[in-house]
Amino acid sequence: MSDFVRADGRALDEMRPVRIVRGFTTNPAGSVLVEFGNTRVMCTASVEDRVPRFKKDSGEGWLTAEYSMLPSATAERMPRESMRGKVKGRTHEISRLVGRSLRAAIDLKALGENTIALDCDVLQADGGTRTASITGAYVALADALTYLEAEGLVSQNALLPPVAAVSVGLIDGHVCLDLPYEEDSRAEVDMNVVMTESGEFVEIQGTGEHSTFSREQLMQFMDAAEKGCSELIRAQKEALSKPYPKRLPNRKNA
């Protein structure tokens, strides 16, 4: 019998405690604090009544995303990237990942020529910041669309079924779900999996950091990720079952 114990004592296929708080800030149409254990991310969704040039006169909207980490999000303070005058490649990569993932959760035609800008700011990082960002951003997006529906600018069909994301990895030869930093930093294999409510994949990012992996292990990773995403989608739906957390606007042109 294996004596392997995870860094925080969880079962191999057990998620960290997940918390989703809507209405975390007052200004954006959608605002969420999402927690995966000690990882905390603020996800906001802001609405702009215009689209990028490549979408102009298309009748479709757009969704874009930006990801960043606060200087004190990690144990050692990191200077702001804006102060360095250059955004890191990792930041660009995660921003694009969040945008791609959430575009799978919205009907851009139903959005009209409006843009939803998602901002994911990591307040505290302990592994899984990109997966927490995607999971929380869906809830912020849902609230932003509720706001637009109240204004009469979009139909109720703009929001598609939930999208969530989770990390999986190989730690000391064991497939583990939802890695904290202590595990993520030494994982032999590390993956991030984005899935829809129906079990379809939006994106799979997988790297053999310190080891190769077999087809059988790949299937184990996918099974663990599917379990984790299903739990996260239940958490998203539970959060969204409550009323919109702020006062809704009056319908325009009513």
From Swiss-Prot:
Which key words tag this protein in UniProt?
Nucleotidyltransferase, RNA-binding, rRNA processing, Transferase, tRNA processing, tRNA-binding
Q: What is its EC number?
A: 2.7.7.56
What's an example GO BP annotation here? rRNA catabolic process
* Enzyme type, top EC level: transferase
Q: Which PROSITE patterns match?
A: RIBONUCLEASE_PH
The molecular function GO annotations come to: 3'-5'-RNA exonuclease activity; tRNA binding; tRNA nucleotidyltransferase activity
Cross-referenced Gene3D superfamilies: GHMP Kinase, N-terminal domain
Give me the residues that bind phosphate, please.
R90, G128, T129, R130
Q: Report the CDD domains cross-referenced here.
A: RNase_PH_bact
InterPro entries the record matches = ExoRNase_PH_dom1, ExoRNase_PH_dom2, ExoRNase_PH_dom2_sf, PNPase/RNase_PH_dom_sf, Ribosomal_Su5_D2-typ_SF, RNase_PH, RNase_PH_bac-type, RNase_PH_CS
Q: Which reaction does it catalyse?
A: tRNA(n+1) + phosphate = tRNA(n) + a ribonucleoside 5'-diphosphate
* Assembly behavior: Homohexameric ring arranged as a trimer of dimers.
What protein family does this chain belong to? Belongs to the RNase PH family.
Described function: Phosphorolytic 3'-5' exoribonuclease that plays an important role in tRNA 3'-end maturation. Removes nucleotide residues following the 3'-CCA terminus of tRNAs; can also add nucleotides to the ends of RNA molecules by using nucleoside diphosphates as substrates, but this may not be physiologically important. Probably plays a role in initiation of 16S rRNA degradation (leading to ribosome degradation) during starvation.
Q: What is this protein called?
A: Ribonuclease PH
Q: Which organism is it from?
A: Corynebacterium kroppenstedtii (strain DSM 44385 / JCM 11950 / CIP 105744 / CCUG 35717)
What taxonomic ancestry is recorded?
Answer: Bacteria, Bacillati, Actinomycetota, Actinomycetes, Mycobacteriales
